[in-house]
């Protein structure tokens, strides 16, 4: 059975000018030589539209509104909600992640934060334990590997 490696690049530079993208590509090529049961799916966060989260998209913390409620919103908002779901589903479908992101101003580029906001969804990638001290529990950690370059 073929597994998926999701390559997430977060740099506006072309690969030949980006150290993080160059190292990531070299790693992926070497990895695929050894593990040929993986296929690569790429997402470039500078080319891909990443929705900015709006309050009306959510019914609860990190929980996108239902399909039925989304239909009550303007088409533009419905499109954004579909994109959020699509990005989250794409992330969930991978067994391994390679993230190529430079360090800018002691952090990573803003599109990566926007992407993380889209994929961190209750009952999909996390669960929220309510109580006096609420806890966030990762759902996918037991079978996923992530390499940040």
Residue ranges and their predicted role:
Residues 128-149:
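Short, glycine-/small-residue-rich phosphate/pyrophosphate-handling segment
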Residues 97-99, 112-135:
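Conserved nucleotide-sugar donor-interacting segment of glycosyltransferase catalytic cores
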Residues 1-101, 106-110, 114:
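N-terminal beta1-alpha1-beta2 submodule of the flavodoxin-like/Rossmannoid cofactor-binding fold
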